[in-house]
Swiss-Prot record:
The organism's taxonomic lineage, starting at the top: Eukaryota, Viridiplantae, Streptophyta, Embryophyta, Tracheophyta
A Pfam match: Hexokinase_2
Residue numbers binding D-glucose: T163, K164, N198, D199, N225, E253, E284
Name of the protein in its database record: Hexokinase-8
A Gene Ontology cellular-component term: mitochondrion
Organism from which the protein derives: Oryza sativa subsp. japonica
Length: 458
């Protein structure tokens, strides 16, 4: 009886999470439509389509010494990149990761940026001899800042709000570049912030440096976002003179995309309702690493309560939100042992579910597969939407298009990555697929910042 009830839960999940190619094409078309609406006017779409003010991407010919600062969570990274022009590319690079003391994450703006500038100063001071800048030229820094900002130029942006574990009230509404610049002056650090970017723009820049056919940078990690190169004359909301390059990098903020075509289940609806931002970031909640483990946990809880298939267990761990994380479901999903030993271990260690039969473990793997496959297929539909907007989804003009993807989910969850890539091929068709490539762009957010500083270099 328990097995029949359990199978009902899984069958319903399978049906509700189905992503046939026809539905995915509708999702891709909806994404392209929202992109157009967001470019039309401010607030015209749930997808913000923010101007990054980056109109020049690296070409691979840049040379000199450039710095990057990457702040997006409880750690930040500082890095130095020595570029050797088109023949040598990156001659060498060094980086250091620094933990931010917790009290600074809710202190004042000057304390946080003072600490960051101090660490940056130490990093710069430890350089070898012979790396002085020529003719008293200032050192150039690219700043990756992965929090919501409103930009008005390539090197300025006011903080809209903090996310993650930060709550520094006096920084909200302030220009984060000016705050950093002031802190660097106080440290006696002769450095100029050449560009303020986010991790998606950094991924695009880092990949473009090596390959001029890269058209978009996409993040599938804890969260998700995308940035791509748009023709400046295709942005009706652009005010002022068009850039000489004729291009503009758009930071899509596509995590907030929504369409009635998205296959949303009761588990997604409950997760959204209980989240800090109900009704927001629906696409992100279906496709990113922050949420996949949590969706699976909710399914397993229903399975336990409705069918009793796990026996008389204490459901307290199974009832704890975010207790099951995406790396756990990835480990279970990739379990290739004949008796699914890893699945048994994870269920026991994390959820205190013991004595499972092989049939039950297979059911758990199937649930992981349904949730991860839906995420990967919807992720591919988003990428197809960008290609559709750019007219690169298989028209007559089959120029090569490369999508650079970074983020832990894409990098470490093999079945997610493989499913995304094969689904993109399915949506584009055999002919168009020949001219589209997906590349893993490792560490875009760090090195990308330094490379954009180089491409903006005066």
């Amino acid at each position: 009886m328990a097995a029949v009830e359990a199978e009902k839960v899984v069958a319903e999940l399978r049906e509700r999470c189905a992503t046939p190619a026809s539905l995915l094409r509708d999702v891709a078309a909806a994404m392209a439509g929202e992109m157009g609406a967001g470019l039309e006017k401010e607030g015209g779409s749930r997808v913000k389509m923010l101007l990054s003010y980056v109109d020049k991407l690296p070409t691979g010919r840049e040379d000199g010494l450039f710095y990057g600062l990457d702040l997006g969570g409880t750690n930040f990274r500082v890095l130095k990149v020595h570029l050797g022009g088109s023949k040598k590319h990156v001659v060498n690079s060094e980086s250091r990761e620094v933990s931010i003391p917790p009290h600074l994450m809710s202190g004042t703006s000057s304390e946080l940026f003072g600490f960051i500038a101090g660490e940056l100063g130490k990093f710069v001071a430890e350089e070898e001899e012979g790396t002085d800048m020529p003719n008293g030229k200032k050192k150039e820094l690219g700043f990756t800042f992965s929090f919501p900002v409103r930009q008005r130029s390539v090197a300025s942006g006011t903080l809209v709000k903090w996310t993650k574990a930060f709550s520094i009230d006096d920084a909200v509404g302030e220009d984060v570049v000016a705050e950093l610049q002031t802190a660097m002056v106080k440290q006696g650090l002769d450095m100029h912030v050449a560009a303020l970017i986010n991790d998606a723009v950094g991924t695009l820049a880092g990949a473009r440096y090596y390959d001029e056919d890269v058209v978009a940078g996409v993040i599938f990690g804890t969260g998700t976002n995308a940035a791509y190169v748009e023709k400046a004359n295709a942005i009706p909301k652009w005010e002022g003179e068009l850039p000489n390059s004729g291009d503009m990098v758009i930071n899509m903020e596509w995590g907030n995309f929504y369409s009635s075509h998205l296959p949303v289940t009761e588990y997604d609806e409950a997760l959204d309702k209980e989240s800090l931002n109900p009704g927001e970031q629906i696409y992100e909640k279906l496709t990113s690493g922050m949420y996949l483990g949590e969706i699976v946990r909710r399914v397993l809880l229903k399975l336990s309560l409705q069918s009793g298939i796990f026996g008389s267990i204490d459901n307290s761990k199974l009832k704890t939100c975010f207790h099951l994380r995406t790396p756990h479901i990835s480990a279970m999903h990739h379990d290739e042992t004949p008796d699914l030993k890893i699945v048994a271990e994870k269920l026991h260690q994390i959820l205190e579910i013991t004595h499972t039969s092989l049939e039950i473990r297979k059911m758990v793997v199937e649930i992981c597969d349904i949730v991860a496959r839906r995420a990967a297929r919807l992720a591919a539909a988003g990428v197809a939407g960008i290609l559709m907007k750019l007219g690169r989804n298989g028209g007559i003009n089959n120029q090569r298009s490369v999508i650079a993807i970074d983020g832990g989910l894409f990098e470490h969850y093999t079945k997610f990555r493989e499913c995304l890539e094969s689904t993109l091929g399915e949506l584009l068709g055999e002919e168009a697929s020949k001219s589209v490539a997906v590349k893993h762009a490792n560490d875009g957010s760090g090195i990308g910042a330094a490379l954009i500083a180089a491409s903006q270099s005066r």
